[in-house]
Structures are given as structure tokens and as C-alpha cells.
Amino acid sequence: GQDIGDPITTNTPWTGGIVDKSWFTAPGQAKYRAPGNVKVPFWLQPETYYKGAAWYQRDIVLPESWRDQRVVLFLERAHWETRVWLNDRFIGSNDSLSTPHEYQLGVDLPPGKHRLTVRVDNRMVVDIGENSHSISDHTQGNWNGIVGRIELRATPKAWIDDLRVYPDVAGRTFRVEGVIANAQPDGKLQTGRMALALQRWHAADQTRISPPVKRLAFPVALGTEKATFGWSIPSGDLAGLETWDEFNPVVYQLTASLPNGSSRTVTFGLRAFGVEGTQFTINGRPTFLRGTLECAIFPKTGHTPTDLESWRKVFEAARAHGLNNLRFHSHCPPEAAFQVADELGMYLHVECGTWPNQSTTLGDGKPVDDWLERETDRILKAYGNHPSFVILLHGNEPGGDRHVAFLKKWVERCLANDPRRLYSGGAG
């Protein structure tokens, strides 16, 4: 840490429940409760503890080449809520625990100096369950800040906002769907052609295997605020595509490009994960998940890593023990974890960051209900193309008299929105 906050005492307002009162009452533990000699036995103890808002401010300089471009602030992983201002103008807020926080700073910003302000708040802005590994002090810790990539990006005013690939394993092909957004729509229906380039992707060294498998082009509309598109690629155009599984983790990259230079690239694999009777199946064949928990336990840093090598170490250790599956207990990993899992053929069970049973409940109209719906959509948009992403749950051990009905509808909505994986109402 940075020695910010208050010294640790018996009254430190930890995030997470404590079920053993002996440290607070037992005579034999008295010396470890004394001021200046506090030793917390439940989890790794920071030197100081801070829960609240932290403010970050700096001047940024936009180059002349960004004139008339859409400028975006990208924060890969924040904990927890961020709020952003540019030149004292409030831009917005974001409360995702699982996905990048992205802010459109403007579409007509003049080149030159601007003042950027970011506020990060690690208090429980929504009660999603005090013991959730996404927020609690039990494992990674209730840290405050931003990790991973912190970037300013410039794009054309019309850009590809979403790109999804739906594999058809039986037909050895796929369907492409997405959204084109326009920051300054003129109301006129403009048409253009979107180019698609498909390539094998060598995940281990992050390189494309040339030449492209296929290049295709399709008509699109550009003049409206939001324009959706979708095409099923004829199987005859995609001869030789291989399926993805733990034994043959073949990964492809699809790049979609607009005439104005905007492009978006996604990684995917040709795979189908399902159920037959009481068994999981991969590409129509029965499989067995040999797994373990990953509970956001990273004691050296106190937060989930965002680099490839850290996750390669985690997954290779699992594979060395004969495992092919990790359950991310009440949290969701960042992009790097999915990339490495794609590469190594690991099956990931991801959760939306909740453990709603001690301090809150599901299905009772509490703020966690709405937050879960929004976080689900954000996770599916950010990571849904990865073939390793085979299972999604809301979180751990749901509580509340109405949680069964609520989660039944949640599963149904998820399947309707994105049928590329399995969904369930909970795990224990």
C-alpha cells in the first residue's frame, strides 16, 4: 500500500463478515488487540486501511491529429465506482467490477491541454453481498484504484461498438452480429461496406498467422445513432475451420472495418458447450470438468492481475495437476485471463461478482437486482466471444425468498441474449 488511511484496530470497518468472535473476546488474544500490536488472524493485514473516495487529476494534451475525432478514456479495471470530469464538466460514472470503464470525453474537443479528473470510490456503492470475492477483504482485499491499461483513445465519430461471433460447429461456420454507433448522427441513411478479415491467432505470442483465412464485405448503414447488423457466413467460404477444445485450442481473430477507418477485432473459437443428460458436452462429445476454485487470491499485489504472464502461471499450474476448469468464485477475471484460457484450452466458469445472502438478497427489489442485470450485460459484451468462457452464474449461494424466481428469469434472459454458453442460478 501507500500508507494512506487509518491504522488497523479492532474497529477497522472491513468489507466482509467475521463469524469467529474469539479474537475480539478471548484473553489469550488480548495482546494482539492492543493498539500498535494489532494482528488480524482472518486474512492478510494491510498496514493501513482506507475506504472512501480517492481523487486523481492531471493535464492531458490532445494532438492535432485527434481534431474532429471521438476521444475515449479507457480504464481497464477499477475498484470500484469511477466518476470522470473533463475541464470541470461531468462526463459520467461507472460501477462495473468486472469490465473496463470507458468514457466518451467528447467528439469535438479542440487539440491542446485539458484537465482530466477521475474519482475512485471503494465503498460498497451497491450491496452485492459483503463476502463477495469481487469486493471483500477476505481474499484480494478492498483496494482502491485502477489497474491495467489506462489509455486515451481516438476513433472516428462512427465506430463499431459491439461485435459478436456465434459459432456453428456442425456447419463449420459462424454468424456475425454487432452494432455501429454514431456520435453525431445526421438522420440520413448512409450506406457503406464493412470488411471482415478472418485469421488464425497464435495466442501464445500474440501474433496473427498469415495470410487471412478469408476476406468478406457486407453493406452497412452509418447515418443513424445505433445500427445493428448480422450476417451468416456461408460455410463454403470457410473451408478448413477447426473446432476449439482443451485438446485442440484453435483460436481465430475476426476484424471488422468501416470505410472511415474504424475497426474492431475479436478473438473466438469454433466451439459448442452444452449438456446431454447429466453430462457436459464440448462440440457434441461428452466431457468432464476437472476443476478448482479461483477466489481472487493474489496476496503479493492485493488485486487481480491484468497481464498475460500472471494468468499463464495460474492456468499452467492447474493443467499440471490434470485440471481443465476454473471456477471464478463470486468474481470475474479481466481480459488477459480469457486470452490465456483460450490459448491453453481451459474451460472457465465465471460469476458476476455477487454473493447475495448475508448482507443482501436477490429478487426483493434491492439495488443488487438492477446492478446484476447491468453487470451481466457488460460481462457478455466484453468477454462473450472467448471460447474458454463456457459457464456464467450470477455468483455464489443466493439468498432471499424470491431468489429462485428472479434467477430463473435471469437465466432465461441470458440464454435469449447470448446462447453461446451455459447459465445457472447459483453455485455453492
Task: For the regions a language model picked out, list residue spans one by one.
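Substrate-binding/catalytic cleft of secreted carbohydrate-active enzymes
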Residues: 325-428
